[in-house]
Design a protein with these regions (language model features):
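Intrinsically disordered, low-complexity linker/terminal regions across diverse proteins
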Residues: 1-264
């Protein structure tokens, strides 16, 4: 609870722009500049800015990403979640969307990032961002058992005949499962909102990849492939079975005792 209460939230863009921004001078082509030369200058400014902070107090208000970044993230060292301006738009958020659709869009993303505070890495950091195992031995043993069940669960999924690496994708799978538990708990028994949330969450991760790129992702990405990222989470979500009347023998059916999650 303390970790949640002290979690910092950054939305949109920083209140103050970093000093390094003023140090960066772009030289146009007309004056002899090039993409490479400007990139090298940018890297040098970044290095000098980082070195200048050695021995100084950490500025927790500083942003490590730009507002133009289409992503969201959790930083365990600062115990903060960050939502740049670029992700606060369709398909993740639309002010004209229904409550259910936005819950399945930006709601799922927010819950996913919060869940990272308690994934297999985030769980090792306390509310101040210190590497400090604050769980009791009993709690950690139980957590490891549940984590292993998630590893085993995802190991059973495959794409193009290749099994998902449940260990590689564990952190992201924990966050996805936690996010689904969170948004369905908030929505409750509203079948229409649940249907819209599931549909939007599915739409968010819809993609079409070449075979070679998919093989690359299977071997390197800490996220499960998008299709599995959706189907595996829904197949472990009790609300999914309830509103669509999923039964044994259906394609996405998983027996109740085999459904997984940390916060079920």
């Amino acid at each position: 609870v303390r970790k949640l209460e002290t979690m910092q939230v950054k939305i949109g863009y920083p209140d103050e722009w970093p000093a390094a921004r003023d140090m960066m001078q772009v030289t146009p082509i007309s004056e002899g500049g090039s993409l490479l030369s400007n990139l090298l200058v940018s890297m040098q400014v970044s290095i000098e800015d980082s070195l200048s902070k050695l021995g100084t107090k950490v500025d927790r208000a500083e942003w490590d990403v730009t507002p133009q970044t289409i992503n969201a993230m959790y930083d365990p060292l600062n115990n903060e979640i960050v939502f740049p301006a670029a992700i606060l738009q369709a398909p993740f958020y639309d002010r004209n969307n229904s409550y259910g659709a936005n819950m399945g869009g930006i709601g799922f993303v927010i819950a996913h990032e919060v869940s990272h505070a308690f994934d297999s890495t985030g769980a090792l950091y306390d509310e101040y961002g210190n590497y400090n195992v604050w769980w009791t031995d009993k709690e950690m043993d139980e957590y490891k058992k549940m984590s292993q069940s998630i590893v085993d669960y995802y190991n059973n999924y495959e794409m193009m005949g290749v099994k998902v690496n449940g260990d590689l994708t564990l952190m992201e799978n924990i966050a996805d499962l936690g996010a689904m538990t969170c948004i369905t708990s908030i929505i409750g028994d509203d079948a229409k909102a649940l249907d819209e949330a599931f549909g939007q969450m599915t739409y968010n991760w819809a993609s079409e990849d070449t075979a070679s790129f998919m093989m690359y992702l299977l071997n390197t990405d800490t996220h499960s492939p998008n299709k599995i990222r959706v189907n595996a989470v829904l197949s472990s979500c009790d609300a999914f079975y309830r509103i669509y009347d999923i039964r044994e023998g259906d394609g996405m059916y998983v027996a109740p005792e085999n459904r997984v999650g940390i916060w079920k």
